[in-house]
Amino acid sequence: MNRLMTFDKYRVFETEFAGRPLKVETGKMTQLANGACLVHYGDTTVHVAVTASEKPREGVDFFPLSVDYEEKMYAVGKIPGSYLKREGRPSEKAILTSRVIDRPIRPLFDKSMRNDVSIVCTVMSVDPDCQPEIVAMIGASIAISISDVPWNGPISGCSVGMIDGEYIINPTEEQRKVSQMATTVASTSSRIAMIEAGANCVSDDDMYNAIMAGHEANQKIISFIEEIKAEIGKPKFEFASLEPDHDMFEAIKAFAEEDVKVALDTDDKRVRDERLKPIYEAVHAKFDEIYPESEALIDECLYKTQKFIVRRWLLDEQKRVDGRGMDDIRPLASEVGVIPRVHGSGMFTRGQTQVLTIATLGPVSDKQLLDGIDGETEKRYIHHYNFPSYSVGETKPSRGPGRREIGHGALAERALVPVIPSVEEFPYALRLVSEVLSSNGSTSPGSICGSTLALMDAGVPIKAPVAGISCGLITEGDRWMTMVDIQGLEDFFGDMDFKVAGTHDGITAIQMDLKISGLTPEMVKEALAKTHKARNYILDEVMLKAIAEPREELSKYAPKMFTTTIPADKISEVIGKSGKVIKEIQAECEVKVDIEEDGELGQVFVSGIDSDKCKRAIEIINTIAVDPEPGAMYLGKVTRIMDFGAFVEIAPGKEGLVHISQLDVKRTENVTDVVNVGDIIRVKVMEIDDKGRLNLSRRQVLIDVDGLVPENDIDAERAARPRRPHNDRRGGYNRNNRK
């Protein structure tokens, strides 16, 4: 007998968030996952599933969490454009969103847990006014909270915009277009768990107030999730901790602590690593027999010993491993013009962290075209970040950019977007590539500084120079302390990496990574103040001394760019049938021509190596787009020679006759004495007859522009001169006085 399925555990929970309905469905879909939910915000719908392995993964010294944010093209009613017609590898935006969701969630898991946990957020429909990234973060928090996976959440997230000084929670699509910032804030019930921001040079106070507005808004959703958890949440499962036991750690710490202190007390990463090698060997020689089959745990104890020492130095003595004060920056160096023939280059060094950035200018058509669930978008400015293994002294094969590289590149890109000139001000596409040459912490802020140097070296008229700096944090109970410009060891053993980029006047980007549950408002405010002071120091004392302002001229190896505007209804004439006309222009002038329609106008971009050829292409295009008028001058190409004159094409499809009498200021016997087929000459439109035929003159150009005098005028001038008397021989040859 057939039976109808019933979903006894199906539940629907509803609330309102920033003036729009938020609905959560559970118990109907994805019943084999540890936890799952379907979240609707407006018409945006995201499905989230959480699964965990039953047993811990062996041989790892970290918590194996993966977060995947998946964009489905059906969510916006599109079929993927690839050959396979299905979604492929995640987009850059999807990877960045996965990282944003991961960052506030990860610290709330027990660090000793080794069970694999997977969180998959699938975007199923998109309402442009309700960002799916925020819905996915909320959905992930709900799914973990109601699952049996141990977690110390919940968290909530929101987007904060600012328009005319007013803070807007989860701004609509139109509001996001005019907002002075795009800030994502995640919170627990008491602390700020994550900040990701891009801003148009806003003040520290504006950014702080936006963060606090987001933190306050998140509290309503956190309470909402707590209610859901209380009603349908599962009991949390027990897991086996793979952390070394207390006695083992204390024994190894007692044996190695003093030697480790000596090893750590240096500002040279290589020296530190060399000092630590014999300590590891000595510890293993003593404890491998005591704790057989526990080599990984012995290494973990040594790692924890280093962490214990560094944190004690910072909290109790305000001592950093390299001897700096808490607000001191490592030695700095800036250099431009490092690499020949490239369009621009800048190298920024901070201690043992060194980043070389190369700037490349290209025609506007080199912009990146993106087609995702946000619709078709364009990126004229692109930043890529590379972190090769040699930068940390390791030998690993290059596998292409990973999530970390994509995330760091996006931060540097976002930091400079507000100062990049508009396409009208600087009609180029821009690509920056930051190569990390050596790394001892804070490479992404270094790539921001290197990018500013490279842009200025390339002659890009940026609105203001941008610098980046990181701020670290050490906490213990109610005690906490911040430090500026953290190096690798302080990043590994500290609680925070708070990266801020900005100009002298304001913030352009923030990225905050935490290893603790969150920050208090006081911690956020202090981090903003310290990074502002530090980036001003970097700009004034180092970067602007290397190059004070963008170069006035572009590199001779950069393409020359010229623009013009034509009526939109003339674009088809410039392109021609099957692109015939525009191809001829590009071939003849050795240039690249790009046209973008903007309402009633067409913006034309011409790029090439030779400025004169670019100008020639612009002139041809303008001639096509504007009907010739009597008195106008054009540069044309001789296409045919006749006995009575030469035909000259001033633009594709626009040809006129230069009569033989109008070829030169002097009498011309043969047309070929003056011009031949293929010659480029400047002509003036003398007349357009009733049939639209053009009568052109080279002779008149020579008179009007070059100031030449026609031959018949010279004859007339000679004829008008008074003649000397026939017998006046002054100054002449006197036959009677011949010698």
List where the protein language model places each region.
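Single-stranded RNA-binding regions, centering on S1/OB-family and related RNA-binding modules
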Residues: Y557-P559, T563-K739
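Glycine-rich, flexible beta-strand/loop modules in the N-terminal catalytic cores of phosphate-handling
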Residues: A33-S118, V123-S125, C130, E196, ...
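Extended amphipathic alpha-helical scaffolds
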Residues: N2-S53, A240-G375, P559-E573, V581, ...
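Long, basic N-terminal domains or extensions that often function
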Residues: N2-A240
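Flexible, glycine/charged-enriched surface loops at secondary-structure junctions
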Residues: K111-V117, N152-P154, I221-F239, R270-V271, ...
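Conserved phosphate/anionic-ligand binding catalytic regions in large, soluble enzymes, centered on
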Residues: G35-C37, C130-D148, V336-A359, N440-V460, ...
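Mobile "lid/hinge" segments at catalytic clefts and subdomain interfaces of large enzymes
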Residues: D148-L264, L455-E552
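Short, hydrophobic beta-strand segments
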Residues: C121, A193-G198, F239-E243, A254-L264, ...
